[in-house]
């Protein structure tokens, strides 16, 4: 994100649209060191713009749509952060070329609810969705979603953006996800 101008201010009828490109997408913006400059510049844009700032967030791995992409919690936290900062709106661009992407319906459900009410907790929304959508496979799918999300929490040295290669998931993490996924279809 480019730094805002030092002296010039957007006119009152000019909306600033901020794309969140080339940053770590698998960790929340507020806690990942790779996102510090983005947050600093975003805060400044929010301060100088009267018509509002709108975020264009990326919720998919555009390099590989069907590979597990741990973004539910990171974008959920970002939605809360944007609300705290006074951002006027958020648009999350996900998979647009296939319906078979990683957890796209679940992600849309969680993020949509958080855009309506950013005080909601992420995990209960995931649980609610799994119970209502997956039926008998709900417990197995909930465990799978949590494993995908936890795959990048430790070690915190794993960072990935919206065009990541599959290397962001370790081999043990991939094997665990395969085992959990198999339980969802038995």
PLM region spans:
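Surface-exposed beta-strand edges and their flanking turn/coil or helix-capping segments
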Residues: 8-9, 29-31, 68-70, 105, ...
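Gly/Pro-rich turn-and-neighbor structural signature
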Residues: 1-47, 57
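Structured mid-domain segments that build the active-site/substrate or prosthetic-cofactor binding neighborhood
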Residues: 36-137, 143
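Repeat-unit-sized solenoid/scaffold elements
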Residues: 13-35, 82-97, 118, 165-177
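Catalytic domains of carbohydrate-active enzymes that cleave complex glycans
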Residues: 2-6, 86-88, 111-186
